[in-house]
Design a protein with these regions (language model features):
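N-terminal secretory/targeting leader peptides
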Residues: 1-72, 90-307
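Hinge/lid segment of periplasmic solute-binding proteins
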Residues: 78-93
Length: 307
């Protein structure tokens, strides 16, 4: 609606449900080939095509440098991230114009059947994790990490195929129904501190647009970033209250040894990928240079204001 209004109706979108034309994991291919003009997905889905996609969609452990979703957007808008993001598609050999539109993080560590006091407790459970580097990092610290699609998680928990799981954050987790099978919820995690969803448009379609239409897409995308962050903070807060006060979910603190073990493994994984891929290294170096300047202020200025 925003784009249609900004362009006076010259650009209109027909919104189709996921899977109507192709599966979610085929979205980028479909846009690239012009099967559909545009699509919506999470850029870390394409980490198998290029490891640097993870750094834009969901940089593990905040890129190993203390970046949260707000700091990530600062890097993206003003620290050189957007220019590197635009190059990603060429690195992947795709005829794509991408727009980052929906920050989602931070995601919760997850749901457990019993409290976990330390990593020894954590290692007792078969744990659903995201695919790719975040999930592999769990395996690197001895967690029985199991990747599976969202629709398979609750049946797997009920069948005992897995014991514990992560999905997203309070609002989506409540809607999903985790509280029906597990009651111990841990918010603080490192696997997906930053998560971003994107809008993709095929290059041929984008290049045929007027300058006004292109600028309208940019303005709408930037507005969406702010609206998404604002929406999720409040909605997740309401959902967390419902989980604890209505559904009897117990909010737990993540064991301290989790952070040291996961961060060390994440940094090792990032270093390995940087050694193997020059563009990955360039993007990560940019993040680290940004964090060296921004994180001391941003993390240092945070405080808990509770009466």
């Amino acid at each position: 609606d925003t784009v249609t209004a900004l362009t006076g109706g010259s650009l209109k979108f027909e919104i189709m449900p996921a899977g109507a034309v192709v599966g979610v994991k085929e979205t980028l291919d479909a846009v690239d080939k012009g099967l559909i003009d545009c699509g919506f997905a999470w850029t870390h889905y394409w980490s198998g095509d290029h490891p640097a996609a993870m750094l834009f969609g969901s940089p593990v452990a905040g890129g190993g440098v203390g970046i949260d979703n707000i700091a990530f957007l600062s890097w993206f808008q003003y620290g050189g991230g957007k220019e590197l993001y635009d190059r990603l598609w060429k690195e992947m050999g795709r005829d794509i114009k991408g727009f980052m539109i929906q920050p989602v993080g931070p995601e919760a560590l997850g749901w457990f059947p019993k409290p976990i006091k330390d990593m020894a407790d954590f290692r007792k459970y078969k744990f659903r994790t995201p695919p790719g580097i975040p999930g592999q990092t769990y395996k690197d610290i001895g967690i029985a990490s199991v990747a599976m699609g969202g629709g398979d998680i609750l049946p797997a928990l009920e069948a005992g195929t897995i014991d514990a799981a992560e999905w997203c954050c309070p609002k989506p987790d409540l809607t999903f129904g985790f509280q029906k099978v597990l009651k111990h919820y841990y918010l603080q995690g490192l696997h997906q501190v930053v998560v971003n969803a994107d809008f993709y448009i095929t290059g041929k379609t984008y290049n045929a647009m007027s300058d006004h239409e292109k600028k309208s897409l940019e303005v709408a995308a930037n507005a969406s970033l702010a609206k998404s962050l604002s929406y999720r903070i409040y909605e997740n807060g309401k959902a967390l209250r419902e989980l604890t006060e209505v559904h009897g979910v117990k909010l737990e603190d993540t064991p301290s040894d989790y952070f040291t073990e996961y961060m060390a493994a994440a940094k090792k994984s990032l270093e390995t990928n940087a050694a193997k891929n020059a563009f990955f290294a360039e993007v990560w170096d940019s993040m680290k240079a940004f964090a060296d300047i921004a994180v001391p202020f941003w993390s240092g200025a945070q405080c808990l204001m509770r009466s």
